[in-house]
């Protein structure tokens, strides 16, 4: 029994004395074109790489579309898809083949956006919430400013490429 206690105490001491804290000797390897790590409380930048370089946000745009839609509608609302919403897409754009006049709940529309990357659902939700895609994009840009995303500018609700559609890590 004494041997067990001695072994337990020896292991505990070994664990306590064996612990060593250290800090990274080299910067992490980041393959992204731009990146930033900040301390949330102080705002101090701990790591940066091309933080003000404009990048194409692609489908990250859909996260902002969903956020603005959720804040300005109810999940139970019905979205009626216009011809413009479902046909105003570039060839090969991701879609779930919503038809003009088709009705989906806001909740189902958001699932289509976030899970299926449905570009026509982004357009339909934008029209439903703000009356037009352009009005909705203005709401997205306002929300970006409110969140401190000063290097971000949206030009559409779905993230398809446009030259004035960009974001930065900072």
Q: What are the roles of these predicted feature ranges?
A:
Residues 2-24:
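Sec-dependent N-terminal signal peptides of Gram-positive bacterial secreted proteins and lipoproteins
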Residues 23-166:
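Active-site-adjacent loops and short helices of periplasmic peptidoglycan-processing enzymes
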């Amino acid at each position: 029994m004494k041997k067990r206690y001695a072994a337990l105490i020896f292991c505990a001491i070994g664990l306590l004395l064996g612990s060593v804290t250290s800090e990274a000797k080299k910067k992490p390897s980041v393959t992204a074109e731009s990146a930033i790590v900040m301390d949330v409380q102080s705002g101090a930048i701990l790591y940066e790489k091309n933080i003000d370089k404009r990048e194409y946000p692609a489908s990250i745009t859909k996260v902002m579309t969903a956020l603005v839609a959720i804040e300005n509608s109810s999940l139970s609302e019905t979205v009626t898809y216009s011809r413009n919403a479902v046909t105003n897409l570039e060839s090969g754009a991701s879609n779930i083949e919503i038809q003009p006049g088709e009705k989906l709940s806001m909740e189902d529309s958001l699932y289509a956006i976030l899970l299926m990357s449905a570009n026509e659902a982004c357009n339909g939700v934008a029209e439903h919430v703000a009356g037009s895609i352009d009005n909705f994009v203005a709401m997205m840009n306002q929300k970006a400013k409110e969140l401190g995303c000063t290097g971000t500018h949206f030009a559409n609700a779905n993230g398809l490429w446009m030259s004035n559609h960009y974001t930065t890590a900072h």
